[in-house]
Amino acid sequence: EISACLVGSEMCIRDRPMIDTEKLSRLLEELNIAVDGYAAQRLDLYAQRLVAWNEKMNLTGITDPDGILEKHFIDSIEPLRFVEIPRNARVIDVGTGAGFPGLPLLIARPDLDLTLADSLHKRLVFLKDVLHGCGLVAERVHARAEILGKDPDYREQYDIATARAVAPLPVLCEYCLPFVKVGGAFLALKGAEDEVAAAKCAMATLGGELEQNVPYKLPSGDSRHLVVVRKISQTPTKYPRKPKKIDTKPL
């Protein structure tokens, strides 16, 4: 079986898809998530390059096709089920790592104006390769979140901020809410543990308000939470603080 995709200016031809694109399409249909027509091919290219680059740098511990499909791609796209993201919205993925959830969201919604921010340059080099292969464009920024969040070119400039990280929710709020303009939202993709109660003080301090706390399950049965924090007022200028204070004295 030959799979060929003409994406942007690059044609990629491979012996067979790495991920089960029929399964992907079926899962997205079951979740009632509409995606761009090239999404399956682009996600397959992403998976192949993720595994290839992972051999020379640590991007992910999940390298099997089903794991990538469900725990990286489906999980990253799930927010589209619960949150209406406006067309052409400005989105920043904070601490993007290997690109999750920001890049799968862009693949599903190429209209988004995406910024991928990370403190490790080599991850951004990997993401440049994937973006080029997919014929997509996103700004890549090599910076620490606590510094970028005080830069006027980025502070309160985004409709949506996203993060998928193991850091506690109060910590994520302090890193991410400063990027969100009033009226926008921070989307935190978290594991099964419900951390919302501990983060309500941080949300209020930073100008946010809990809008949704949605539990959902991946096709594998793994439990997740999507926490949606609406920005209702500007973040005080003292935030975000330095990482040591954020970690040792969380809001």
Protein language model regions, located:
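Conserved beta-strand signature within the Rossmann-like core of class I S-adenosyl-L-methionine
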Residues: G183-E193
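Short "lid" loop at the C-terminus of a central beta-strand within the Rossmann-like core
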Residues: E146, P168, G191-E195
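Residue-level signal for inorganic ion chemistry
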Residues: L50, L105, L127, K190, ...
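Conserved SAM/SAH cofactor-binding pocket of Class I
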Residues: I77-A165, C173
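Single conserved hydrophobic/aromatic residue that forms the stacking wall/gate
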Residues: E1-D15
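Helix-to-beta-strand junctions that scaffold the AdoMet/dcAdoMet cofactor pocket
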Residues: R109, V180-V182
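SAM/dcSAM-binding transferase cores
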Residues: A197-L251
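Class I SAM-dependent transferase core
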Residues: I19-R87, I92, K122-A138, H142
